[in-house]
Amino acid sequence: MTDMFLMPVSPETEAGAIVALNRETEENGLRLTHAQAEQLVEVRAQSLRRTGRVEFAPGRVGRIIRAFCGSPYLSREDYVDTLSALIELFDTVKTETDDRISDAVLIEEMRAAFDGACHGSLELLADEVISRVVRRANARGGAEWKMTEDT
């Protein structure tokens, strides 16, 4: 029997899964076209190459979309660009922390900081808060933690 976890997912299939999330995001006025979903799949692939990461199970882009779609700081105009930046930032932090933070915890912390201390600023999220996340995760050796504004 083939292990489903290790079966590669085609970019077309992944883009289709992203478009299917429109059912969840439309209530917030956010919608992706198939072309935009393909763009996000390509951003993910480039980010993985840039950081030297390998992804065994698809769905990370969908988890980021689900986590951020309710943010008051997202708009239709910058939705794809913001998601692209979040995908890249996610991979950067995972690499810099040697995967000491689970995907779920990292996404939760990114969303909390984005809506909280960063007030929707990707620059603040990348430059200040995420650098603190990396330092703290590395200092604690991966112990579970929650980020605070003074972290």
Predicted regions and their residues:
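Short terminal alpha-helical segments
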Residues: 1-49
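Extended, low-complexity, Ser/Thr/Pro-rich intrinsically disordered regulatory regions enriched
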Residues: 2, 138-151
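Acidic, low-complexity, intrinsically disordered interaction modules
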Residues: 34-35, 39-144
